[in-house]
């Protein structure tokens, strides 16, 4: 996979935003889940782009992969962040074992997980409530719409999304979907944080992501995490396999508009 020709100019333009260090910073990720899950392709896309950027910034990124059946006894000490495509029960168990490490949820939409407010689970994928709220907002303006709510879609073109979709399709010969975008976003927001801060400890990265993150994600808004760990983000509304608009829906959502979607509070 060669991203270099396409992206050297892009990397040169963003160098001024990051700190360049003399020594090489090596960052390790681990993915826990099935190899067939589409989030893994997004993770790999993010890793490729991060390593391309890292050539200019003296940073290297690597990825290990295991299934949920192989986590017992695995040494997680070297990983800056954990990327998962597992169910709610498995995700809770992983987060409990790795309480000072960012554990990214790339797949589970459970509202209960957001109510739990587990301190180290970071939900990239939107909750069911976020999608439901987005559709309810659309119904106010378009009562007859049969749209579905997505976090990503292969026809999305705004905010440089077209370029991301093209890069992904070229590399993996499939269309980027919700899960593959989530995998890409988790890696990219972490590597961008490393570029800006040179963080090497997982506990420091968790603190940064929860409290200082601003991430575009090719969605045109500065995304960050709620106290319950959910990533604030636009929701794409898709009808007939095309993006027709985004939520929060203008003229319907009340400010702060991104918080008009989904769960804000913890149960306890």
Spans of features found by a protein language model:
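Extracytosolic ligand-binding ectodomains
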Residues: 2-3, 8, 21-268
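N-terminal signal peptide c-region/cleavage motif recognized by signal peptidases
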Residues: 17-19
């Amino acid at each position: 996979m060669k991203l270099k020709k396409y992206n050297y100019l892009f990397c040169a333009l963003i160098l001024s935003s990051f700190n360049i260090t003399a020594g090489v910073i090596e960052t390790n990720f681990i993915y826990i889940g099935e190899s067939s899950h589409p989030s893994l392709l997004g993770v790999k896309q993010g890793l490729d782009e991060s390593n391309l950027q890292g050539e200019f910034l003296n940073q290297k990124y690597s990825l290990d992969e295991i299934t949920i059946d192989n986590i017992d006894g695995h040494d997680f000490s070297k990983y800056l962040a954990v990327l998962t495509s597992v169910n709610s029960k498995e995700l809770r168990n992983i987060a409990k074992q790795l309480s000072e490490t960012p554990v990214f949820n790339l797949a589970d939409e459970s509202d209960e997980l957001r109510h739990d407010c587990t301190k180290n689970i970071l939900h990239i994928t939107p909750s069911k409530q976020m999608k439901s709220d987005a559709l309810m907002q659309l119904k106010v303006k378009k009562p007859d719409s049969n749209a579905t709510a997505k976090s990503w879609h292969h026809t999305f073109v705004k905010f440089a999304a077209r370029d991301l979709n093209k890069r992904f399709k070229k590399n993996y010969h499939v269309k980027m979907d919700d899960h593959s975008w989530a995998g890409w976003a988790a890696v990219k927001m972490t590597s961008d944080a490393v570029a800006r801060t040179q963080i090497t400890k997982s506990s420091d990265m968790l603190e940064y992501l929860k409290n200082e993150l601003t991430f575009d994600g090719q969605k045109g808004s500065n995304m960050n995490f709620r106290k319950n760990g959910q990533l604030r983000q636009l929701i794409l509304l898709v009808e007939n396999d095309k993006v027709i608009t985004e939520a929060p829906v203008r003229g319907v959502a009340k400010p702060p508009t991104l918080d008009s979607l989904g769960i804000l509070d913890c149960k306890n």
